[in-house]
C-alpha cells in the first residue's frame, strides 16, 4: 500500500548549502520532517552543482518521511552565468547588460530541456531567449 501524501513543499536552495535556518527549517518543521536528515541528503545530492540555486520539490508523507526531487538550476541563473552578469537590467527594453550567442542559448536549452514544458529544442530555445530578453540580455549570432 502506498504512503499517504500530506504535503508538497517547493523551495529553491543553494546547491550543497541546505541548513536548518529559514527558508528550509520553518518549511519542513511545520510538516514534522527531520530537517537535518533532509539537509544532509540534499547537500550530498547537490554538492557538485556549483553555486546555483536548485529548485527542489519535497513530498511529505503521513509517517513524517519524505522524498525529494531536484531540478536543474533556473534559466535566469544559467543565463547570468553564461553572460557573466550579476543581475538583469532594470529596464530591459533600453538597457542591455550583456550578450549571448545562439550556441550558448542552445547549451542552456539542452541543459533545461527535461524541466521545460516542451518537447522540441526550438521551443526550448525560444523559452530561453524570452527569459534572456526580459533580463536585458541581447541574443547575437
UniProtKB/Swiss-Prot annotation:
SMART domains: RL11. One of its GO terms (molecular function) is structural constituent of ribosome. The keyword Hydrolase does not apply. GO terms for cellular component: cytosolic large ribosomal subunit. GO terms for biological process: translation. It holds the Pfam family Ribosomal_L11. It comes from the Bacteria. Keywords: Methylation, Ribonucleoprotein, Ribosomal protein, RNA-binding, rRNA-binding. The keyword rRNA processing does not apply. InterPro entries: Ribosomal_uL11, Ribosomal_uL11_bac-typ, Ribosomal_uL11_C, Ribosomal_uL11_C_sf, Ribosomal_uL11_CS, Ribosomal_uL11_N, Ribosomal_uL11_N_sf. One or more lysine residues are methylated. PROSITE patterns: RIBOSOMAL_L11. NCBIfam families: L11_bact. Forms part of the ribosomal stalk which helps the ribosome interact with GTP-bound translation factors. Part of the ribosomal stalk of the 50S ribosomal subunit. Interacts with L10 and the large rRNA to form the base of the stalk. L10 forms an elongated spine to which L12 dimers bind in a sequential fashion forming a multimeric L10(L12)X complex. Belongs to the universal ribosomal protein uL11 family. This is Large ribosomal subunit protein uL11. The gene is rplK.
Amino acid at each position: 500500500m502506498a504512503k499517504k501524501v500530506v504535503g508538497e513543499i517547493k523551495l529553491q536552495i543553494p546547491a550543497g548549502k541546505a541548513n536548518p535556518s529559514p527558508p528550509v527549517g520553518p518549511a519542513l518543521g511545520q510538516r514534522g520532517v527531520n530537517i537535518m536528515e533532509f539537509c544532509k541528503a540534499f547537500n550530498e545530492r547537490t554538492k557538485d552543482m556549483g553555486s546555483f540555486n536548485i529548485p527542489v520539490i519535497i513530498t511529505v508523507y503521513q509517517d513524517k518521511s519524505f522524498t525529494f526531487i531536484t531540478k536543474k538550476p533556473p534559466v535566469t541563473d544559467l543565463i547570468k552565468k553564461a553572460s557573466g552578469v550579476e543581475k538583469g537590467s532594470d529596464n530591459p527594453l533600453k538597457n542591455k547588460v550583456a550578450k549571448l550567442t545562439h550556441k550558448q542559448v542552445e547549451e542552456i536549452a539542452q541543459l533545461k530541456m527535461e524541466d521545460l514544458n516542451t518537447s522540441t529544442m526550438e521551443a526550448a530555445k525560444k523559452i530561453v531567449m524570452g527569459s534572456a530578453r526580459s533580463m536585458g540580455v541581447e541574443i547575437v549570432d
